[in-house]
């Protein structure tokens, strides 16, 4: 790992990509501190907020707590992406057709995803501006329809800029731009979290100091165990044996070798967690339009609180559902079976074609069950950590944040390593 990091700066092209990515993240962090005009951020207080707003603040690197131009983060884009992927599943025939057209079709779908981001972002921004002014009186000193619309437009523009920033990182930097931005937001909150632990559990602890240190050490061990578990599950594979039949090409026998088909335990990576989080946050944000005094809005806000038993169950089910959904987008058993048949390959004891497809699908369902359950369990661990250690809710230790940070870090390092390997072998190819 450390060798890979040192090698990055020896390759000019890769070095430029890494520097470009870092510069884009600096722009993101600067924007997180630029407040929306016409607002008073001093009235916002997200300490001990264990609801959707606390989540959004954590994953935006504190941008929501500053009520900055990036307060909504990249979540509307993720929600729009989910909607577009659902519509591609023969719901909208034109979208399904574009999905099969390769690069040209993907460009058209990406354009519609951008349009969807703007629409959903504006709805969410309007709900956020009205709702936050109800929750935190004085946030908008002179509320009116025109002021609310202006603030919604500024927040939507901030999300659109982040979307563009993510696309630039993907095209000219390293890793998936959207995931990198979310990663940066979570990582930016780590120093504040550590400082909060110190101020609440170490500073002026008195006679409780030793006990608090023991609890914090146990917590650190638990977090380390989660990180190891996440890496293990992300790297775990099920190897299905594949045999290729011998055939004659001219007078030479070709094929006959044995290999394997690798299926990951968690083929979807951390994308299901990001998708679930985006969808989980959306309803309470929109409910904010009606204020906490409205009975239905109050119920939605309370239910979509991840410390609430129902909210916890909904969040876990969303993660499990999206893991299955995204796994079968990433891995297509029908296409795999078809390719094996065309190449003269078969799984020992399984007939080529439909039987192979059914076999791969069955194994994929079992693997995904384990992977999705692991993601769901780890994602809701912060609730138990916080209660066990009696820590402020704002710290949001472990769980979703750890999954995203470790998952994105692993994926990015793999991409960088692949780039390094490609450059190392360039001389042999020539």
From Swiss-Prot:
The chain crosses the membrane at residues 18-38, 67-87, 118-138, 145-165, 177-197, 213-233, 270-290, 309-329, 369-389, 390-410. SUPFAM superfamilies: Preprotein translocase SecY subunit. One of its GO terms (cellular component) is plasma membrane. It comes from the Bacteria. PROSITE patterns: SECY_1, SECY_2. It is a multi-pass membrane protein. Pfam families: SecY (PF00344). Keywords: Cell membrane, Membrane, Protein transport, Translocation, Transmembrane, Transmembrane helix, Transport. One of its GO terms (biological process) is protein targeting. It is found in: Cell membrane. Its main location: membrane. Belongs to the SecY/SEC61-alpha family. HAMAP family: SecY (MF_01465). Component of the Sec protein translocase complex. Heterotrimer consisting of SecY, SecE and SecG subunits. The heterotrimers can form oligomers, although 1 heterotrimer is thought to be able to translocate proteins. Interacts with the ribosome. Interacts with SecDF, and other proteins may be involved. Interacts with SecA. The central subunit of the protein translocation channel SecYEG. Consists of two halves formed by TMs 1-5 and 6-10. These two domains form a lateral gate at the front which open onto the bilayer between TMs 2 and 7, and are clamped together by SecE at the back. The channel is closed by both a pore ring composed of hydrophobic SecY resides and a short helix (helix 2A) on the extracellular side of the membrane which forms a plug. The plug probably moves laterally to allow the channel to open. The ring and the pore may move independently. This is Protein translocase subunit SecY. It comes from Halalkalibacterium halodurans (strain ATCC BAA-125 / DSM 18197 / FERM 7344 / JCM 9153 / C-125). The gene is secY.
